[in-house]
Amino acid sequence: MVTILQLLVSILILLSFALVVGVPVILVSPGEWERSKNLVYASAGLWFGLVIVTAAFNSFVI
């Protein structure tokens, strides 16, 4: 159970890092926002879902 929680947290950290680096680059690049808008929204939704799943799973571990 703890290993699964550690895996979820690791994925959350990696996705957070990718969003912190990627979103500003997309916003600064001219014309890139229109092409990557769906990817940014999908990634943000995945991040939010992963936060909820990790929090729910954490309540079972402790």
From Swiss-Prot:
Keyword terms: Chloroplast, Membrane, Photosynthesis, Photosystem II, Plastid, Reaction center, Thylakoid, Transmembrane, Transmembrane helix
Domain of life: Eukaryota
Pfam family, one: Ycf9
Keyword Nucleus included in the entry's annotation: no
Gene Ontology BP term (one): photosynthesis
Transmembrane segments: 8-28, 41-61
Membrane topology of this protein: Multi-pass membrane protein
Subcellular location: Plastid, Chloroplast thylakoid membrane
UniProt keyword Mitochondrion present: no
GO CC annotations on file: chloroplast thylakoid membrane; photosystem II reaction center
Assembly and binders: PSII is composed of 1 copy each of membrane proteins PsbA, PsbB, PsbC, PsbD, PsbE, PsbF, PsbH, PsbI, PsbJ, PsbK, PsbL, PsbM, PsbT, PsbX, PsbY, PsbZ, Psb30/Ycf12, at least 3 peripheral proteins of the oxygen-evolving complex and a large number of cofactors. It forms dimeric complexes.
Function: May control the interaction of photosystem II (PSII) cores with the light-harvesting antenna, regulates electron flow through the 2 photosystem reaction centers. PSII is a light-driven water plastoquinone oxidoreductase, using light energy to abstract electrons from H(2)O, generating a proton gradient subsequently used for ATP formation.
Family named by the database record: Belongs to the PsbZ family.
Name assigned to this protein: Photosystem II reaction center protein Z
Species for this entry: Guillardia theta (Cryptophyte)
